[in-house]
Amino acid sequence: MFYYGDAPSKNAVIKWLYEMAYKQGLADEKLYHSIMNHENVTSTYFGNYLAIPHPEIFLSETSFISVAILPKPILWDDEYVDIVFLVSIQKNNPNAFKLWSYLSFLISNNTTLEEIKKEPTFQNLSKVISKIYEDLF
């Protein structure tokens, strides 16, 4: 699930990304409320203009990521963000934690994030993530 375009606010981006997952049958309202509750408790800004909103607890039957790339950064709490990964990890699946390995590489690698921003398409995002997978495993 992928969005490229402008966004008025943090809450709007979260809602759009959640709605994409909802329309695919991957999310329900309980997940959305858990994500928003988590946002109210702590920031999901991770540095390098990247935010990773996620629920307080694992609620999904399937792991998924919804991605937004924003041509103009938006304020995310006290920082600016132009890439958002809404992440939900499958409950009761210890292998699903591998997803955080990919994301931690992205967070710490500014070059990779710049590659994604340079060509903000789903195809390029898939290519970059595939390369991360090859490099890590």
Where are these regions (language model features)?
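Cytosolic covalent-transfer regions centered on His/Cys nucleophiles
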Residues: 1-137
